[in-house]
């Protein structure tokens, strides 16, 4: 049932010519998902999601990122973000657009 619905949806999408990058019907009845352009993708994608008989293929191998890769991206962007916000706050205060008031001395 799901295979038939996926094939019908693929035929409607491919037949209308609206977007050929979502699903396409391959030779032999296989339904594939992904880009149909000739350019190679840097991200590994899975082109065929259903076998010819209609069975769904098993999950692909998951690639873990690792803490070193995550921190090597997060920390520099956090630092750049703090520099931008600090400089923008100083600019606003310099032009008297926003001057914070210390109202904490109400004791």
UniProtKB/Swiss-Prot annotation:
Mitochondrial intermembrane side of membrane: 86-107
GO biological process: calcium import into the mitochondrion; mitochondrial calcium ion homeostasis; mitochondrial calcium ion transmembrane transport
Membrane-traversing stretches: 66-85
Post-translational modification (record): Undergoes proteolytic degradation in neurons: degraded by AFG3L2 and SPG7 before SMDT1/EMRE assembly with the uniporter complex, limiting the availability of SMDT1/EMRE for MCU assembly and promoting efficient assembly of gatekeeper subunits with MCU.
GO molecular function, one term: protein-macromolecule adaptor activity
Subcellular location: Mitochondrion inner membrane
Primary residence: mitochondrion
Alphabetized UniProt keyword annotations: Calcium, Calcium transport, Ion transport, Membrane, Mitochondrion, Mitochondrion inner membrane, Transit peptide, Transmembrane, Transmembrane helix, Transport
Pfam families xrefs: DDDD (PF10161)
Motif (GXXXX[G/A/S]): 81-85
Ranges per topology, Mitochondrial matrix: 48-65
Recorded GO CC terms: mitochondrial inner membrane; uniplex complex
Presequence boundaries: 1-47
Membrane topology: Single-pass membrane protein
Function statement: Essential regulatory subunit of the mitochondrial calcium uniporter complex (uniplex), a complex that mediates calcium uptake into mitochondria. Required to bridge the calcium-sensing proteins MICU1 with the calcium-conducting subunit MCU. Acts by mediating activation of MCU and retention of MICU1 to the MCU pore, in order to ensure tight regulation of the uniplex complex and appropriate responses to intracellular calcium signaling.
Subunit structure, as described in the record: Component of the uniplex complex, composed of MCU, EMRE/SMDT1, MICU1 and MICU2 (or MICU3) in a 4:4:1:1 stoichiometry. The number of EMRE/SMDT1 molecules is hovewer variable, ranging from 1 to 4 copies per uniplex complex, leading to uniplex complexes with distinct gatekeeping profiles. Interacts (via its C-terminal poly-Asp tail) with MCUR1; the interaction is direct. Unprocessed form interacts (via transit peptide) with MAIP1.
Family: Belongs to the SMDT1/EMRE family.
Domain notes: The GXXXX[G/A/S] motif at the C-terminal part of the transmembrane region mediates interaction with MCU and is required to activate the calcium-conducting pore in the uniporter complex. The poly-Asp region at the C-terminus mediates interaction with the polybasic region of MICU1.
Identification of the protein by name: Essential MCU regulator, mitochondrial
Protein species of origin: Bos taurus (Bovine)
Gene name of this polypeptide: SMDT1
